[in-house]
Amino acid sequence: MTTTTTTTMSTLPMVLVDEILSRVPITSLRSLRSTCKRWEAQSKTNLVGGKATARKSSYLGFILIGNKICSMKLDLNGGDDFVDTSVNQISAFDDFEISQLFHCDGLLLCVSNKHYYSNTVMVCNMYLGETRLIEHCCLLEGFDNFGSYAFGYDSSKNRNHKIFRKKLVSGGYEIYSFKSDSWKDLNVDLGESTELCELGSVSLKGNAYFSVITKHEEEELWENNLLCFDFTTESFGKFLSLPFDNVTAEEEFGIMVLSCVRDEHLAVLYQLDTLGIWISTEIEPNKVSWREFLQVDLYTLDGFPDAFTAGRFIVDEEKQVVVVFNEATEIDLNHGNAFIFGRDGYFTSFNVGDTPPQDFTSYVPSLASLQIEKTGG
């Protein structure tokens, strides 16, 4: 006699459930969770415990291609098939054209690509399926598509998330509080000679770190600097030390890009004659120390394209490689628009979409809600 056992989602071993959930695109998890309460509970446990992104060779993120938001899963496998990518445009946002992406605590800040100003920005929790449109009370002070922004939260128990931005019309800076659902001006000043770089901020442990440029006009020198904005004190710290020579003549000025390593460390890339990457060993709003991760002489790489401008990047400490997106305006797709550099001299390229990626952010899902808290009374 043969006995047939029907296995349903609710009776699958949790080891297998974990494996399945780790492979499901973040934008599909919401509909999947609704089919089984056990899976919903386990997916949330995975998020809180970090299992959903625990695969050290797998990276989850969002990328802008043609001003459209796409989810991207990147697997660094090693060997001949070193990289495996999966890029999918998110149909729910087909009507939105986006120019910048910022990630903080599982939330995604999306800046509109409307020229010249938009009166709203959008914040999403892709895992919870929540979206919040944030308006500005003054149309003339709308959101510039390539303005300076930062995303973070304060040290309060419930993590009040905040958005920082530079005002281009009236000057100065302002901040939005999710808790109060309001904007306010900030009493901070960087001086006339220091500028926040476009696409220049990343969020780490609630604070934002900016790539900034200080111009010394009389000496005809430019200076790269690193600056922290503390969302608890709502103020800038002092310039933080950088691990490379950060003062050069204007015509020799290099490219500096910031990234986060597993939301634990800050990484800085600097491209001039060589491409160097350093990772923080200790970081606070007013103090940082570094260790070198990678140095590459681009001119010695056989077949490396002339048109290369380092953009957003991903560091894989386990496999000792870095993935760098090419932001050059004219790219030969035969060379690829993303590059992998290894500490052992390894180099290869691959394509992400048919056009150069405009922005990228790694993503760590969370249960942070975008619902506005209602006060009693």
Swiss-Prot record:
InterPro entries tied to this protein: A_thaliana_F-box (IPR050233), F-box-assoc_dom_typ1 (IPR006527), F-box-assoc_interact_dom (IPR017451), F-box-like_dom_sf (IPR036047), F-box_dom (IPR001810)
A Pfam family hit: FBA_1
SUPFAM superfamilies cross-referenced by the UniProt entry: F-box domain (SSF81383)
Disulfide-bond pairs as recorded: none
F-box domain boundaries: 6-52
Coiled coil residues, start to end: none
Matching NCBIfam families: F_box_assoc_1
Name of the protein described by the UniProt record: Putative F-box protein At3g13830
Organism name: Arabidopsis thaliana (Mouse-ear cress)
